[in-house]
């Protein structure tokens, strides 16, 4: 499996080391489109065997004095900043991911052409998000990586907050990861909130149709904010109402924020005063 990043933009490229690997995955899953989800255990195993590599493949004829191979101990931010004109490839041995159950999850036909790939959150460990303690072996969930987002966020992030909610057996576990940056305009804050609300409602609708399907998606806001929302189970009318109330509260907070809504203090007031929207549903 090969993921390509060009100047911070994710381009999905799937390659199998052999035709036998592809046939084996198809045999286990029953669908030839099964491409690209890797469990945390599989990634961990692959890393420990040094079968995961990151490499910068230069697109220019000029040679660089710095090494093009990404070391596991190297800071990815510096690695990216020093190599602007290159492809950054992340390679995972497909054979090393095969033994574990559910090592791959089928994607809809044509999904790869849209430059969208679904991986578990622990893929972030591969690129050393050392301050994100989001990955646990017992709590597996997916993060949707859309074109251009993952390394963009890596390169410019300044603060990460993790919110985890549990509400007994009636509701599933809700994860919200908000990546906050140094300047956020009030209009962007409102726009991001509306954007989150629309996508959250869409996701809960999908969950309701699929009987407790769990998914986690990356929602790109305009300019300087990204939010990860974990939606568990089918949506309910009460959940939609709660999300709408949170949205309205966020807009009120953003509109009433004094000044030009720039700077760290204003950003924190804007985002930490419930200026995030979450969606949660009943588990089956």
From Swiss-Prot:
Keyword Membrane: yes
Residues spanning the membrane: 174-194, 217-237, 241-261
Cellular location(s): Membrane
Protein keywords: Membrane, Transmembrane, Transmembrane helix
Gene Ontology cellular component annotations, sorted alphabetically: membrane
Residue ranges of coiled coil: none
Membrane topology annotation: Multi-pass membrane protein
Principal cellular location given in the protein's record: membrane
Note: Partially overlaps GAT1.
Name of the protein described by the UniProt record: Putative uncharacterized membrane protein YFL021C-A
Organism of this sequence: Saccharomyces cerevisiae (strain ATCC 204508 / S288c) (Baker's yeast)
